[in-house]
């Protein structure tokens, strides 16, 4: 799509979102989690359950309780799987790389390994934090697969899952409702989530990447386009602005992902997105796939988005 039409399309999208929110261009925020009414007249092929209605999101029927859709959970042996299990065009090229591993918060319930992948040539550095919420499984499944990525240039840091205890127990929280993604920049002397947030934040500060990817999933459904699933969130983009909107438009043009994505911002206070952008001046993109879709579709979307950026930056 020519850039002038893309800019026009972006303007129309922003106008639509702003009219729904009643805001001005400087007041772009994530969507309110307000339930929407599901149509009882729509033809459905799903068997309903007590307390659940049927909604259709991007052509897919799913069950909805008035606030959240029913999670399409799947326990995959992800470390035995390959990129090709989620798409024939994913990470097909192979390049020689060097790798090293190190651990954050050693000996704690939050202990997590960071894998550092280095291509043969110098280039951009990307830091991927996948699964700060442990029950957002497609996010950290994608992160586990990305540990097998190779690069022709540049460097990749991958921590997946970032919330190891939450992933182990399939819960959003680290423990006792401690939300890792509301704990940044964290504290060396705080609770478990705050200590882990601090370790991740300090590692990003040390590495100084060009971009941070924050891989997530959403389960709350509101109405139409105004819900968090299938979205890209940013706070400050800096030099990554053109790349971000080219990525967004690629989903809307049908070039990328199973359905179009929309954008929101800024990231919430205490989130990795908001904190690294405002305190370190490093652009961060939060990817939110939608948990009402089947797991393969969600993992594939996460991988396609990361691959798009790596190719955009000529790292692959």
Segments (PLM) and residue ranges:
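Bacterial N-terminal signal peptides that target proteins for export
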Residues: 1-8
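Alpha-helical transmembrane segments
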Residues: 11-15
């Amino acid at each position: 799509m020519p850039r002038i039409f893309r800019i026009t399309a972006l303007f129309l999208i922003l106008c639509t979102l702003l009219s729904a929110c009643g805001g001005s261009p400087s007041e772009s925020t994530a969507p309110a989690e307000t339930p929407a009414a599901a149509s009882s007249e729509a033809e459905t092929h799903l068997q309903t359950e007590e307390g659940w209605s049927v909604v259709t999101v991007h052509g897919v029927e799913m069950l909805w309780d008035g606030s959240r859709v029913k999670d399409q959970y799947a326990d995959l042996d992800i470390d035995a799987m390959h990129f090709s299990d989620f798409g024939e065009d994913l990470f097909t090229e192979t390049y020689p790389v060097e790798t090293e591993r190190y651990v954050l918060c050693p000996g704690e319930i939050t202990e997590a390994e960071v894998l550092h992948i280095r291509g043969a040539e110098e280039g951009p550095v990307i830091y991927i934090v996948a699964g700060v919420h442990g029950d957002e499984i497609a996010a950290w499944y994608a992160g586990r697969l990305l540990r097998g990525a190779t690069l022709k240039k540049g460097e990749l840091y991958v921590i997946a899952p970032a919330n190891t205890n939450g992933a182990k127990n399939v819960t959003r929280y680290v423990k006792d409702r401690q939300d890792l993604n509301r704990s940044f920049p964290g504290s060396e002397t705080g609770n478990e989530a705050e200590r882990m947030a601090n370790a991740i934040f300090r590692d990003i500060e040390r590495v100084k990447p060009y971009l941070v990817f924050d891989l997530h999933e959403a389960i709350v459904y509101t109405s139409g386009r105004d819900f968090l699933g299938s979205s890209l969130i940013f706070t400050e983009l800096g030099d990554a602005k053109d790349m971000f909107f080219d990525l967004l438009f690629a989903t809307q043009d049908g070039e990328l992902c199973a359905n179009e994505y929309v954008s929101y911002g800024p990231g919430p206070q205490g989130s990795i997105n908001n904190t690294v952008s405002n305190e370190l001046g490093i652009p961060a993109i939060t990817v939110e796939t939608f948990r009402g879709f089947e797991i393969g579709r969600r993992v594939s979307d996460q991988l396609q988005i990361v691959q798009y950026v790596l190719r955009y930056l000529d790292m692959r």
